[in-house]
Amino acid sequence: MFDTHTVEIEWAGRPLKLETGKIARQADGAVLATYGETVVLATVVSAKAPKPGQDFFPLTVNYQEKTYAAGKIPGGYFKREGRPSENETLVSRLIDRPIRPLFPEGYKNDTQVVVTVIQHDLENNPDILSMVATSAALTLSGVPFMGPVGGARVGYINGEYVLNPHLDEMDESSLDLVVAGTYDAVLMVESEAKELPEDVMLGAVMFGHKGFQPVLDAIIKLAEVAAKEPRDFQPEDYSALESEMLGLAEAELREAYKITQKADRYAAVDAVKAKVKAHFLPEEGEAKYTAEEVGAIFKHLQAKIVRWNILDTKSRIDGRDLETVRPIVSEVGLLPRTHGSALFTRGETQAIVVATLGTGEDEQYVDSLTGMYKERFLLHYNFPPYSVGETGRMGSPGRREIGHGKLAWRAIRPMLPSAEQFPYTLRVVSEITESNGSSSMATVCGTSLALMDAGVPLAKPVAGIAMGLILEGDRFAVLSDILGDEDHLGDMDFKVAGTADGITSLQMDIKIAGITEEIMKVALSQAQGGRTHILGEMAKAITESRGQLGEFAPRIEVMNIPVDKIREVIGSGGKVIREIVEKTGAKINIEDDGTVKIASSSGKEIEAARKWIHSIVAEPEIGQIYEGTVVKTADFGAFVNFFGARDGLVHISQLASERVAKTQDVVKEGDKVWVKLLGFDERGKVRLSMKVVDQATGQEIANEKKKEEAAE
């Protein structure tokens, strides 16, 4: 019934198995991939023909994690998986980026990749396995695809590169880098690092590229026995249209791209486009080409002319040379009632970034396959349509916004203080108010400024820069701080963020083969110069974190209590801690290890809560004098509440220096009194004395002390 084919190899010390022919047989391509004991199913379906009027390649990648893969049941009311999590969105992008450039130009059939994690061994991250399984499924499917693609994760532990480290090894690694590519080219890099130099980062890329070569061999081996017949796809030949259009519009387009102001440049390009449309799409008579074909070739021509201009003149669209960064203006304290704020403007790209400090209650609970954990640093990136002068949909963030926010998050996180050093939850929101390229890197810069303005003790300021690279034969140009118009026409787009001493995040997307290690080295070196320049411009606004928090930020004091006392502080059903919160006004968060965080904007409220908790967990000291309240009287003495919730007995003989006939003659319930802790009886009961303490001053009476010492 099943025509199954399997290939198995040893990869980085674990078995990798690729199997096809048994599951999801109606998909164009389906591969069940196993690494260690993590299992994913990747499927590919591509329509047999494009939709009429389709003018782009509609590729969709859906990565989904099923909770049953880790032996869990989903939370929530409905107890089933819902909308994609942030991690699922990020892995979907990770799979998409290296495969998208490998579909032939002109292929416009609806194509969907669905990757499902169906088993997780809690050791091997399914993201790399998903990339491999997707590549294998595409290679087998018969869909036109110039693969296969391999992928690998690279760690850097104790000065050594590690291929596909286990999940628990990542805690020791100063690098988390994912690289994907073909036999002879790197196509995609995504990474987070702890201030590593450029040569170490580039070395990791090449190490990963070499590391996934056996995977490519395995995919080819599987395809040799299981691949479907390739679909017959011949891209349309538009060389005649391009040649004619070039003759008609080249001179005017070159002039249009000499205009440095974005709006004026767009107007000039639109005028040329209108002329081209009028020529090739006349209102009267039958047009030789469709509007989609004319539009696509015009777009292609725009890219060619900009590339030629840059390579020929070493001058760019806005008049800059290759290495110059656009003018930068940095401001902090823009919104004085917020906890920290910054306005970062670089040319026509601008971000308002606001930092908010919260308590442990504000931490985000993340329910992942590997278990529940709490995230104390959140970074949200918003890209409204007005930022590019357009109208558009507003609502929940899209994949691009989530991806850009995570890139900035990775860049900043290595410089954040530890929870012990700075026990706040941090949320940063970046509002992109203008965009003409590199808005994610503007977010990195703005976040660094806003956090320093908020008084968050960042180890060092962080800056980011977006770079481009154009390669034609043996000529190439590296562009620093690319514009939006330059973003899509390059052969390599990469974003580098870091401090003056090293890289904290690197993202690369390489679209063609032929970009050598040497070219990447030049590009990273130029990016380092740009990053250093940007850090200098940021320093004009603020050079280091403020010494104190903003006026409106909450204060947090941390204290530690014995674990066995947690129950006493919380009380039955939370009664005690609720009373402390209600009466002091402070927020209180208690961890399982006995760490107590007390938060309030008022120092008095924090101190009141701290004293209250201390009185519950601390033990009274023998010989110390305490103020107390009489809570009950009896014939043999009075019970005094003197240390938090602790009561003790003042025996009738200890009420006063003279003989006392009746307890009520000396004290009544509710009286405030001073008592000295004499000790504990054989049953552990507290023994208190009033007669050795001056009830007016709370000071010990000297002669009574001598009598007491003599009696002892």
UniProtKB/Swiss-Prot annotation:
UniProt-annotated binding residues for Mg(2+): D487, D493
Keywords of the record: Cytoplasm, Magnesium, Metal-binding, Nucleotidyltransferase, RNA-binding, Transferase
All residue ranges annotated as the S1 motif domain in the record: 623-691
Needed co-factor(s): Mg(2+)
Pfam families, alphabetized: KH_1, PNPase, RNase_PH, RNase_PH_C, S1
Residue ranges of coiled coil: none
SMART domains according to UniProt: KH (SM00322), S1 (SM00316)
Primary subcellular site in the record, as a coarse category: cytoplasm
GO cellular component: cytosol
Cited HAMAP family: PNPase
The protein's name: Polyribonucleotide nucleotidyltransferase
Organism: Rhizobium etli (strain CIAT 652)
Gene transcribed to yield this protein: pnp
